[in-house]
């Protein structure tokens, strides 16, 4: 235990914007801080429910929004670290915390007295003199508590609490297993010749990975979150490609202590039982009922509509790849581990474009400063100043202060670029502090990526995919930074799951925008800009390989939907995870063995340990809005302050304070049109 008077998590930070002083925080501070924060939040809720007077917006909704400040501060501080630097000690805390957090959340969300007060306000909405944000706050809290089960009887609530606590343990276990198995499956190569095709920097990084593991003289390639590893596009040795892909696909399914198959089957079964308890046919029905999609049927209709042309295009792409293979001295039947490598050969033949050779033009610092930041300055007038005096949670994480054009402060942005064994896979954005006029706070947002760290003294050269990820995650960061809401419940990215990817996807449009690209895509040695003919080829090849890209994404989305369409009885009958996946993919026609799903279930962190259960469709759902918005920018002059201000004020700034599709109509002037998405992905032919 630590003394509350000296626990830095229980003291107001004296740093700018309320940034936690990570220099003072030790692992042993976290659990005592959570215990104190849980207790304080319970007292705050009791103070609301003990009020004897009639519920008013002030004594119920405002009081509720002001509650939980300490808990939110402690939780955001901890979960930032547990995702990005999960040492063994942090993982132990995470496991111990999971059931405690679930129990506390249930105690609040299922509080009958609190629910009764909010329901009274909801029933009287027509008689209350509230502004639109206040009305929507009442509606959302009522909807969310109902959705969580606040209207159930005591026996049902008891079972619901048991389910939620068990699920919190299982999802934490899934993530812990995945991190451990991913590290365990890093592929060891004895000879540099096996890694022919990698750049000098990539080879040096592999040698350093081996040295870090006590394997001097060898080479270690660590796995990424996706099934397909970026190195598959450049490794010339077919056996090396096969080993890398097989290692990736075996995660969580090897019969060892990190096997996730039983874990995920129990997750599916308990989610289905919970959905039934709450009055829904399936977990997918439960989730989508409170999203813009509205129902699983709407999701399935979109996925099936896209799957047919995507699979057709993938087959055509496969035939083109096979022709390249057949022309070689020793032809063979193309397999999944060959796709990316021969895709680059076809790209080179058809477009005279070698994407792997572009990295010298994408030096990370230049991409950040002259690309990501420069585009944001042009659109929104904001500027960025690095604050090396402010501590982040890890030495690799960098802190930037953000100001508006008039000099007013907007918040802090933290970038944590590099991969490490203690960081979970993928890329993400999270908030350490959320904006709120009520609380007088400005945001602190974090972007995490998993770019391999180069050897000491070497530059960080990005792939085009990594450049895309950087722009994408910064789109989320802008959503968090630009929040202009009164109530913390609505801050930044606190929007429907199938809407949240929309702003981040829109930010990707500036990657190849002429004045942005010309500023950041410069050769690291000569300073020469990326040649115009290469830029033209990048544009010409934008729809290239989209059959594969769309199919592998849709396959993962469909697996997610298939699991979460099951009722509890059907879920209990599934014993073979691989067979279930295969049947699901055959059902939608995405069972081409040369096009593996982006994630298999045993390492599908988004849906079994993240917030995307029954919601992985959100990326393509949001992309309908994104593609339509990109058309709007192009029609209205592109990268201008006027356009940026409109997007900021009508979409990014409102956060979750109004219905997202209403906000979209306010920005666009109409509902989104699917045609731009179909054209972008080559699905309209």
Across the structure, where does each feature detected by a protein language model lie?
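N-terminal helix-rich structural modules
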Residues: 1-199, 633
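C-terminal, non-catalytic "cap/extension" segments appended to globular domains
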Residues: 2-32, 36, 218-220, 349-351, ...
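Short His/Asp/Glu-rich catalytic/ion-coordination signatures at enzyme active sites or charged loops
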Residues: 14-29, 78-97, 120-162, 222-262, ...
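Intrinsically disordered or highly flexible coil/loop and linker segments, enriched in small
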Residues: 39, 43, 47-54, 70-87, ...
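Short, hydrophobic/amphipathic alpha-helical patches that form generic packing surfaces
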Residues: 69-80, 139, 143, 339-347, ...
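Active-site-proximal, well-structured secondary-structure segments within enzyme catalytic domains
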Residues: 133, 137-139, 166-169, 176, ...
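Short, hydrophobic/aliphatic alpha-helical segments
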Residues: 260-272, 444-447, 485, 654-656
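Short pre-active-site segment immediately N-terminal to the catalytic Zn-binding motif
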Residues: 452-471
């Amino acid at each position: 235990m630590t003394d509350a008077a000296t626990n830095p998590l229980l003291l107001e930070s004296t740093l700018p914007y309320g940034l936690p002083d990570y220099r003072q925080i030790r692992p042993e501070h976290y659990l005592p801080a959570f215990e104190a924060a849980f207790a304080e939040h319970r007292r705050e809720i009791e103070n609301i429910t003990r009020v004897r007077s009639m519920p008013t917006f002030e004594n119920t909704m405002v009081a509720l929004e002001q509650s939980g400040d300490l808990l939110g501060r402690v939780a955001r501080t901890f979960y930032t670290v547990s995702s990005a630097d999960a040492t063994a000690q942090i993982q132990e805390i995470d496991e111990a915390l999971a059931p405690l957090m679930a129990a506390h959340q249930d105690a609040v969300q299922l509080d009958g007295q609190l629910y009764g007060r909010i329901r009274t306000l909801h029933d009287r909405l027509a008689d209350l003199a509230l502004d639109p944000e206040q009305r929507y706050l009442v509606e959302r809290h009522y909807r969310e508590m109902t959705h969580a089960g606040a209207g159930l009887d005591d026996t049902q609530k008891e079972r619901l609490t048991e389910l939620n606590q068990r699920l919190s343990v299982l999802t934490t276990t899934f993530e812990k297993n995945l991190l451990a198995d991913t590290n365990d499956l890093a592929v060891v190569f004895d000879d540099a010749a096996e890694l022919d095709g990698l750049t000098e920097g990539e080879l040096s990084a592999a040698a350093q990975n081996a040295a870090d593991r006590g394997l001097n003289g060898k080479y270690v390639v660590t796995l990424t979150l996706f099934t397909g590893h970026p190195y598959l596009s450049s490794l010339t040795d077919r056996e090396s490609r096969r080993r890398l892909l097989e290692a990736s696909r075996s995660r969580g399914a090897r019969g060892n202590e990190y096997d996730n198959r039983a874990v995920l089957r129990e997750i599916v079964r308990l989610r289905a039982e919970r959905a039934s308890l709450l009055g829904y046919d399936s977990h997918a029905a439960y989730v989508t009922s409170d999203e813009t999609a509205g129902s699983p049927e709407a999701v399935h209709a979109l996925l099936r509509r896209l799957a047919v042309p995507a699979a057709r295009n993938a087959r055509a792409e496969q035939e083109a790849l096979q022709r390249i293979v057949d022309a070689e001295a020793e032809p063979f039947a193309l397999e999944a581990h060959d796709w990316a490598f021969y895709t680059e050969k076809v790209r080179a033949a058809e477009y005279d474009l070698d994407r792997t050779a572009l990295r010298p033009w994408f030096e990370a610092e230049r991409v950040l400063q002259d690309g990501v930041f420069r585009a944001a300055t042009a659109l929104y007038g904001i500027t960025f100043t690095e604050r090396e005096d402010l501590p982040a949670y890890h030495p690799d994480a960098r802190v930037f202060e953000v100001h508006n054009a008039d000099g007013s402060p907007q918040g802090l942005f933290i970038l944590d670029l590099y991969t490490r064994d203690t960081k979970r896979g993928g890329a993400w954005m999270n908030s350490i502090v959320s904006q709120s006029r009520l609380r007088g706070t400005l945001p602190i947002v974090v972007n995490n990526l998993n770019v391999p760290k180069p050897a000491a003294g070497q530059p960080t050269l990005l792939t085009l995919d990594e450049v895309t990820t950087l722009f994408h995650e910064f789109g989320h960061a802008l959503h968090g930074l630009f929040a202009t809401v009164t109530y913390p419940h609505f801050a930044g990215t606190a929007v429907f799951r199938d809407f949240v990817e929309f702003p981040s996807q829109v930010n990707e449009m500036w990657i190849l925008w002429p004045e942005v690209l010309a500023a950041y895509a410069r050769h690291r040695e000569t300073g020469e800009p990326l040649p115009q003919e290469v830029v033209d080829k990048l544009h010409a090849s934008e729809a290239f390989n989209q059959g594969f890209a769309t199919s592998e994404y849709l396959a993962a989305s469909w697996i997610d939907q298939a699991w979460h369409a099951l009722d509890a009885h059907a879920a209990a009958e599934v014993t073979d995870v691989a067979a279930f996946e295969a049947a699901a993919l055959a059902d939608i026609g995405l069972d081409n063995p040369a096009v593996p799903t982006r994630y298999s279930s045993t390492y599908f962190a988004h849906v079994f340990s993240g917030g995307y259960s029954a919601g992985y469709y959100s990326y393509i759902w949001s992309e309908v809005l994104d593609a339509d918005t990109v058309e709007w920018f192009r029609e209205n002059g592109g990268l201008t302050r006027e356009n940026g201000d409109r997007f900021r004020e009508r979409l990014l700034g409102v956060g979750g304070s109004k219905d997202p599709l209403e906000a979209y109509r306010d920005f666009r002037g109409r509902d989104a049109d699917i045609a731009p998405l179909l054209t972008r992905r080559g699905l309209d032919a």
